[in-house]
């Protein structure tokens, strides 16, 4: 609920011309690297010596951070506004606060999994008008699980994220049954079953007569090719 309260406080207080160009970021040059902040220790209140000692994540924490970065960036790229990416976050760069967050771009050590993920997020957002100009509609929020829609005159897209350690059945309505899914989880009987830390994105397109068209894979635009 607090997530939607925060988002709606922005949506309801900015005109569309400003809302759709707001900078959405999860990391900047003034903060610890996003992957470090998500999976590592909180550097607030610690000096540079401590931050230097804790600057590199363990292998298990780094793997966890990659997963958490995917979840965070999926939300970042599908909320109203423009996703703003701090250089290197898409490559898996880690580091505590300044100066540890300002290392050179790792041209020879890019995290291929995360880099590919960000490329697809960019393609999806650029190819789907609902993410660029669509109305934001909250759908569900409970126990670290959220679902929301972005709706334009051309299409409607639903984003559902389970950021908990429990399997959750998210009520979204039977109108999403048989919709096109970019991830494994689908709507069945009006519910999306999400495994722990799973997410999904469903899409449907509107017909000229006001109905909905659930496009098969071969007729989907490039932005809706499965990741």
What are these regions (language model features)?
Residues 1-217, 221-223, 227:
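Active-site and adjacent substrate-binding regions of carbohydrate-active enzymes
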């Amino acid at each position: 609920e607090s997530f939607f309260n925060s988002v709606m406080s922005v949506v309801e207080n900015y005109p569309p011309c400003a809302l759709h160009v707001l900078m959405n970021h999860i990391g900047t040059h003034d903060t610890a690297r996003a992957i470090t902040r998500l999976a590592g220790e909180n550097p607030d209140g610690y000096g540079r010596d401590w931050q230097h000692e804790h600057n590199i994540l363990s292998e298990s924490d780094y793997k966890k951070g990659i997963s958490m970065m995917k979840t965070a960036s999926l939300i970042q790229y599908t909320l109203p506004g423009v996703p703003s990416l701090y250089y290197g976050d898409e490559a898996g760069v880690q580091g505590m606060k300044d100066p540890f967050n300002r290392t050179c771009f790792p041209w020879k050590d890019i995290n291929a999994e995360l880099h590919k993920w960000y490329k697809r997020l960019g393609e999806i957002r650029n190819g789907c008008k609902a993410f660029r100009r669509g109305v934001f509609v909250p759908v569900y929020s409970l126990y670290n699980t959220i679902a929301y829609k972005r709706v334009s005159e051309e299409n409607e897209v639903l984003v559902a994220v389970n950021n908990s350690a429990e399997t959750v059945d998210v009520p979204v309505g039977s109108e999403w049954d048989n919709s096109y899914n970019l991830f494994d989880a689908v709507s069945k009987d009006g519910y999306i079953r999400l495994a722990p830390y799973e997410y999904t994105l469903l899409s449907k397109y509107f017909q000229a007569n006001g109905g909905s068209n659930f496009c098969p894979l071969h007729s989907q635009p490039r932005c809706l090719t499965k990741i």
